[in-house]
A protein has these predicted regions:
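Short, conserved charged micro-motifs
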Residues: 148, 331-337, 392-398
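Conserved PLP-enzyme active-site core in the AAT-like
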Residues: 15-19, 87-294, 299, 414, ...
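Short, well-ordered beta-strand elements within core beta-sheets of diverse protein domains
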Residues: 263-273, 322-329, 385-389
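PLP-dependent enzyme catalytic core of the Aspartate aminotransferase-like
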Residues: 86, 141, 183-184, 340, ...
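Conserved N-terminal alpha-helix of the aminotransferase class I/II PLP-enzyme fold
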Residues: 30, 41-96, 126-133
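Conserved small-domain helix->loop->beta segment predominantly found in fold-type I
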Residues: 283-355, 369-375, 414-423
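N-terminal glycine-rich, Lys/His-bearing helix-loop that initiates the first secondary-structure elements
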Residues: 1-59, 412, 416-429
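C-terminal core of ALDH-fold dehydrogenases
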Residues: 7-28, 32, 333-373
């Protein structure tokens, strides 16, 4: 089946021609909110408990919702199908998913602790802080993609990257990184998993597993949910790594709530349509921003004509996506005034929602990263990140253009009161 069909029918929990649909079965998967489940015999319950403790995806009998929930499992199966993976494991948030990846890879099956992580900047600010702070006992080496292989040591347990990267939209050649890692494995004598945060691309535009990565990580809060009303994270991977991730989830407790699982499951059905329509809007805005005199730089895959980006848009990623970032020519104060001068676009963190969101990463999503590290990874204070939604692209451009032009003319955000329009306010943090 083609991707769009799988997105709809995997999310409904049956194949399109399943006769059961005509036998009084629910058309939409239900929500199982139970925290615990009864059992007939202690021995049967013990067998099921053992299977879940070992990280199995299913057991003969459900035991406890922290170990397994049918609603969440339905979402996991559907996402794995779209990613071309053996399995996926869902978590309460994207950060819970990333944390589980770091923990699971630090303690592989051979029992040797490998807490060293090789990572490529930029990444999401929370991920950067998790690795840099050593909060869960990890040590990180930040390197350029070309230097990943040389940075791998005997105690390296993970290579982590984002592509496109948050918030610069920098693209990394996944195949090339995987090849460097596999080359280094011969030197150190063990496998080093490669995890790719593919949140910006979604399974619609990119499948890291098919490119050789071991794990494809998502903040499901973003595009997978798509409406700004559900939080979650997920890792698509092999069944071997899925078992390890389920064991981490079982002990740390970062489980996805069943209602969130239901909403994410539902969100997959419209994911291809949303991603492509949002991408079409983003293309238009990126091109217009690149030609606006108040804008000094636009970051959007392919717009600069960079040969690597153009090649990866042919061989790795099936489109640029719908997130872009741009720098305001007059600096950080001017960037602030642009944001505060907007009337339609929502001032809020997060991304991937049906409405358009804007924020300054250096002040919000990447504030936790050291200032020097932010600058070095291409996140200056005058950079604005725009997650493009499903509104009319002309309405979005009119809003951006009036805010940019007001700043260019030196009026700033006082244009709001001059037009008698109160700015939209978001309570999102």
């Amino acid at each position: 089946m083609r991707f769009e069909t799988r997105a709809v029918h995997s999310a409904r929990g049956h194949e399109p021609r399943d006769p059961a649909r005509e036998l009084g079965q629910p058309h939409v998967p239900g929500i199982d909110l139970s925290t615990t489940y009864g059992f007939r015999t202690s021995s049967a319950a013990a067998d099921s408990m053992e299977a879940l403790i070992q990280g199995e995806a299913e057991a003969p009998n459900s035991i406890y919702a922290r170990l397994h929930n049918p609603t969440v499992a339905g979402f996991e199966r559907a996402l794995a199908d779209l990613e071309g993976a053996d399995a996926s494991v869902a978590f309460a948030t994207g950060m819970a998913a990333i944390t589980a990846v770091v923990m699971a890879t630090a303690a592989p099956e051979d029992g040797v602790r490998r807490t060293h992580v090789v990572a490529v900047r930029p990444v999401y600010g929370g991920t950067d802080h998790l690795l840099t702070s050593g909060l869960i006992g990890s040590e990180v080496s930040w390197v350029a993609p070309d230097d990943v292989g040389e940075a791998i040591r005997e105690d390296t347990g993970l290579v982590l990257l984002e592509t496109p990267a948050n918030p610069t939209l920098a693209m990394v050649d996944i195949r090339a990184v995987v090849a460097r890692v596999r080359g280094a494995e011969a030197r150190i004598g063990h496998h080093v998993p490669v995890a790719v945060d593919s949140t910006f691309a979604t399974p619609v535009l990119q499948n890291p597993i098919a490119l050789g990565a071991d794990m494809s990580v998502h903040s499901a809060t973003k595009f997978l949910g798509g409406h700004g009303d559900v939080m979650g994270g997920a890792v698509a991977t092999s069944e071997t790594w899925a078992k390890a991730l389920r064991q981490v989830r079982m002990i740390t407790g970062g489980i996805l709530h069943p209602l969130a699982g239901y909403l994410l499951h539902r969100g997959l059905q419209t994911l291809p349509v949303r991603v492509r329509e949002q991408q079409a809007n983003a293309r238009v805005l990126a091109e217009r921003l690149a030609n606006h005199p108040a804008v000094s730089e636009v970051h959007f895959p392919g717009i600069s004509g960079d040969p690597l980006e153009l090649r990866l848009l042919e061989t790795q990623q099936r489109g640029p996506g719908s997130v872009l970032s741009f720098r305001v020519r007059e600096g950080s104060d001017a960037a602030r005034r642009v944001v505060e001068g907007l009337r339609l676009i929502t001032r809020a963190v997060s991304l991937g929602s049906v409405d358009t969101l804007i924020q300054a990463p250096a002040h919000l999503t990447h504030r936790v990263v050291d200032a020097e590290d932010r600058e070095a990874s291409g996140v200056p204070e005058d950079l604005l990140r725009l997650s493009v939604g499903l509104e009319s692209v002309e309405d979005l451009w009119e809003d951006l253009e009036q805010a940019l032009s007001a700043v260019a003319l030196g009026r700033g955000s006082e244009v709001e009161s001059a037009h008698g329009v109160e700015p939209l306010v978001s309570l999102s943090v």
